[in-house]
Amino acid sequence: MKKLLKSALLFAATGSALSLQALPVGNPAEPSLLIDGTMWEGASGDPCDPCSTWCDAISIRAGYYGDYVFDRVLKVDVNKTITGMGAVPTGTAAANYKTPTDRPNIAYGKHLQDAEWFTNAAFLALNIWDRFDIFCTLGASNGYFKASSAAFNLVGLIGVKGSSIAADQLPNVGITQGIVEFYTDTTFSWSVGARGALWECGCATLGAEFQYAQSNPKIEMLNVVSSPAQFVVHKPRGYKGTAFPLPLTAGTDQATDTKSATIKYHEWQVGLALSYRLNMLVPYISVNWSRATFDADAIRIAQPKLAAAVLNLTTWNPTLLGEATALDTSNKFADFLQIASIQINKMKSRKACGVAVGATLIDADKWSITGEARLINERAAHMNAQFRF
């Protein structure tokens, strides 16, 4: 049985390193691996010994924490219907779109194509009886997200009647054939957690852990690519809690009441892991249940444009004639997309359960290095290097 357990853990720890995939689970035996101190000699307190003191029971470890999520499985969290848009254009004649209607939300049920999240931090753990850890990380995180334009509600106004655009004209089309991607800045992040060895038998350890992480990065660069509208915005600002229509100044230098595009990241996780010590190497395998959310308060960001036309242009949006053979000069804004904007919808985990495999290398019971790969609910890699004081 022992040989079977050793073989299974070694195969999982080494074989899965080729296919990297929440938060790291960590080695369940980690609280009891470093039993000697770099600066002070280790002394484990026995809770059943009446002569033991808390000074014997407590120790501190510190080190580096790196977590790299290459593909988090996320979806957008929106309602089935969207309110405040104009009616769907029909026929060939230009028209006014001033009456709001409820329409199916093109973002509903959409998944993200790519979601990356990278964290580098300092690690600090308070150890009790060489069995339980209470730990925290303080560092910096940044991310990258990519999805179809439908997932972020790229909308605009086309086919509008008249020689000017009234302030009450509503967007009437949703652009689904496009891509939206954005990068966040690198900002402060933190996490707290606890880990403990629940059961030990010989060299095997069964443990559990809980973690919570948080960060509030701002969008650094937004890139929207579609046929009717294409634009890039550095450090975008937008409207929160503002119903359609957006102000006519939206996207210009004269825009007011805009706010920074800040994403609120929250994640919690619980995990259960099994490890087996093989001299200096301690492989482990675990399962975890996690929930992550990325919420930008549904901020709506308008396409950048000129406040006044130059060479008859306010944006680089193309003129769309379709079957027409000549421009409609009486409705001069009907043939290209106006007041285009996107909404950064709330994103959350699409799969909650995942698997992690890893191994810890120990040196002199004072130093350790851990590598971990995670699968199913994300593809991620984790590295942890620490020492005991």
From Swiss-Prot:
Topology term for the membrane: Multi-pass membrane protein
Record's function text: In elementary bodies (EBs, the infectious stage, which is able to survive outside the host cell) provides the structural integrity of the outer envelope through disulfide cross-links with the small cysteine-rich protein and the large cysteine-rich periplasmic protein. It has been described in publications as the Sarkosyl-insoluble COMC (Chlamydia outer membrane complex), and serves as the functional equivalent of peptidoglycan.
GO cellular component, one term: pore complex
Main location: membrane
One biological process term in Gene Ontology: regulation of cell shape
Pfam families xrefs: Chlam_OMP
Record's subunit section: Part of a disulfide cross-linked outer membrane complex (COMC) composed of the major outer membrane porin (MOMP), the small cysteine-rich protein (OmcA) and the large cysteine-rich periplasmic protein (OmcB).
Protein name: Major outer membrane porin
InterPro entries reported for this sequence: Major_OMP_Chlamydia
Disulfide bonds: none
Cellular localisation: Cell outer membrane
GO molecular function: porin activity; structural molecule activity
Family: Belongs to the chlamydial porin (CP) (TC 1.B.2) family.
Secretion signal span: 1-22
Keyword set, alphabetical order: Cell outer membrane, Cell shape, Disulfide bond, Ion transport, Membrane, Porin, Signal, Transmembrane, Transmembrane beta strand, Transport
